[in-house]
Amino acid sequence: MDAQSAPSGQVQVRFTTRNEDLAVGDTPIFVPTSLKRYGLSQIVNHLLKTEKPTPFDFLVQGQLLKTTLDEYIVQNGLSTESILDIEYIQSTLPPAYLASFSHDDWISGIQLTSDTILTSSYDGIARVWDKSGEIKFQSTGCGSSLKSASWHIPNQSFLTASLDQKIFHWVIEEPESMLDAEKKSSGILQTLFVGHKDIVERVRSLESSSVFISASADNTVGIWDFERSPETTLESFSSSISKKRRRKNAEFTPQAGARSPLILCEGHTGPVMDIVFSDDPSVAYSVGQDHTIKTWDLITGQNVDSKITKAPLLCVEKLTDLHLVICGSSARHIVVHDPRAGSDKIVSHTLSGHKNLVSGLSASPENPYMFASVSHDNTCRVWDVRATSGSIYTISRAEKTGSQWDKLFAVDWNKSIGIVTGGTDKQLQINQSSSFGKSE
């Protein structure tokens, strides 16, 4: 009997899950082929014998089931005489739009804490926002557009990376009295880090370490230390700031002077676009326009592994619990890579759906399988690596500019604020749902 002759028949299915707490056993059972997601969810809940039903989504051969089983079987040329393996995952609600905060120029970087949003912009200014949209701190513009920002100590100090090859370390000073409590915090330019010979595309730091890392268009990865990086002169920095502006703004002189990198790591043959720490803070992964994913020993500065992919890579993020690295490419897809020693696959699989290059990635703060991406197609997409057929949700811009050229550059995602995105429309957009991103 085939699916064509028995569209309302039955098929044997084997329900599977990667969450042991929700497992129902692997014994195949017969179910009507007329069932969709809701009917299958009822069956799984019945097998689980839970007091409160849990909504589930279902994956068949990596595809989210959006039709009846019968339609899926017919469309994919399968037989009802074979056992159909169906993976179930907890459903999530679409991320709801909450708010947008306006910038004066393009938004290039975003990093969240539990109650603040750090942004970098092409106007050369870094801003710290609270969740209501109030600017709590604003850095002084240093004469060049910013490409990236990273908290060192949340709500106390952060780094910015610029088009003019520099990295700035800012320290936030809180108001001294209750009378000043409603004013913006003031800031100190603490240290200038110099050494790259081209745009610093990305800077990343960890609160638990004095070491931070950078990716540059000069084909190098920078390893720096707030305490151990060698001191150097301020001449090149001073020459880029006009005398009038230096007299007017004492903030332009870094209080702790300038420092050079511990190591500039060579190995990429094209611009390095992004870098991320591994779970081991002495290891990092970088990606570049030379199509490669490289693994670095941050103690020695050595490139310990390199994988070549089919397209230039523009951004990178880690999925900690899965021991995977995801990379956004100029070919519009997302590469899922296993960097562990002994993994002989260059690419585990790819995820497709964006209509332009993928410019930013951020892992879900709660669900180990999920992450968000942004693209020059001006959308943010939410993915589950188990669903290989495409993204789960697409988040469009809430405020339309009417320009077909708008692009998104940056995304970050945490539990307390949500998914925050920004780009050429100058809008910092926040999307969140109370149950969105819940881990299984």
UniProtKB/Swiss-Prot annotation:
Modified residues (Phosphothreonine): T140
Protein source organism: Schizosaccharomyces pombe (strain 972 / ATCC 24843) (Fission yeast)
Region spans: Ubiquitin-like (UBL) domain: 11-90
Name of the protein in its database record: Ribosome biogenesis protein ytm1
WD repeat residue numbers: 102-139, 141-180, 195-234, 267-306, 308-347, 353-393, 403-440
Keywords: Nucleus, Phosphoprotein, Repeat, Ribosome biogenesis, rRNA processing, WD repeat
Source species, domain of life: Eukaryota
GO MF annotation terms: ribonucleoprotein complex binding
Subunit structure: Component of the NOP7 complex, composed of erb1, ppp1/nop7 and ytm1. The complex is held together by erb1, which interacts with ppp1/nop7 via its N-terminal domain and with ytm1 via a high-affinity interaction between the seven-bladed beta-propeller domains of the 2 proteins. The NOP7 complex associates with the 66S pre-ribosome. Interacts (via UBL domain) with mdn1 (via VWFA/MIDAS domain).
GO biological process: assembly of large subunit precursor of preribosome; maturation of 5.8S rRNA from tricistronic rRNA transcript (SSU-rRNA, 5.8S rRNA, LSU-rRNA); maturation of LSU-rRNA from tricistronic rRNA transcript (SSU-rRNA, 5.8S rRNA, LSU-rRNA); ribosomal large subunit biogenesis
SUPFAM superfamilies registered for this protein in UniProt: WD40 repeat-like
GO CC field: chromatin; nucleolus; nucleoplasm; nucleus; PeBoW complex; preribosome; preribosome, large subunit precursor
UniProt main location, coarse: nucleus
Function: Component of the NOP7 complex, which is required for maturation of the 25S and 5.8S ribosomal RNAs and formation of the 60S ribosome.
Residues where Phosphoserine is found: S242
Entry similarity comment: Belongs to the WD repeat WDR12/YTM1 family.
